[in-house]
Amino acid sequence: MRHKCLLAMAVVASMAFYSVISTKNVTQVDTVQQENRRLRPRVEPTANELDKQSDVDTKLEADRRLGYPGESGFMLEGELEERGGFPWRTFFLGLFASVIEERGGFPWRTFFLGLFASVIGVSIISACYGIT
């Protein structure tokens, strides 16, 4: 029983470590992409490209009216909220947004990931040792 508890604690610790490391990597990639966009010269779309985009937008709007999920296989943004469901996507995007961190604010993402890992870790330890 004790070996299973140690294994579970090791898994939780590795997940927490991975999530913190991946958070830093995502922030670095976002920064590089923003820099590349800033350095790239702006190119105005041609009339042909605008027509193609208009056709795609029209098809997506028609699919949305018919109830199809769209090209990516996922519901369009905000569609669940429009149908009266809880805005989970908005909730989690706001919870794990790194915009505040990038601007020097409080690291909310790291805070919540650490809090989540701590709660799971404490639950596993209390279950292993019979603490209620």
UniProtKB/Swiss-Prot annotation:
Transmembrane segments: 111-131
Localisation: Secreted; Host endoplasmic reticulum membrane
Membrane topology field: Single-pass type I membrane protein
Keywords: Glycoprotein, Host endoplasmic reticulum, Host membrane, Membrane, Secreted, Signal, Transmembrane, Transmembrane helix
Superkingdom of the source species: Eukaryota
Glycosylated residues in this chain: 25
Motif annotated as RxLR-dEER, chain positions: 37-83
GO (cellular component) term, any one: membrane
Signal peptide bounds: 1-22
Subunit note: Interacts with host transcription factor NAC069.
Protein's recorded name: Secreted RxLR effector protein BLR08
Organism of provenance: Bremia lactucae (Lettuce downy mildew)
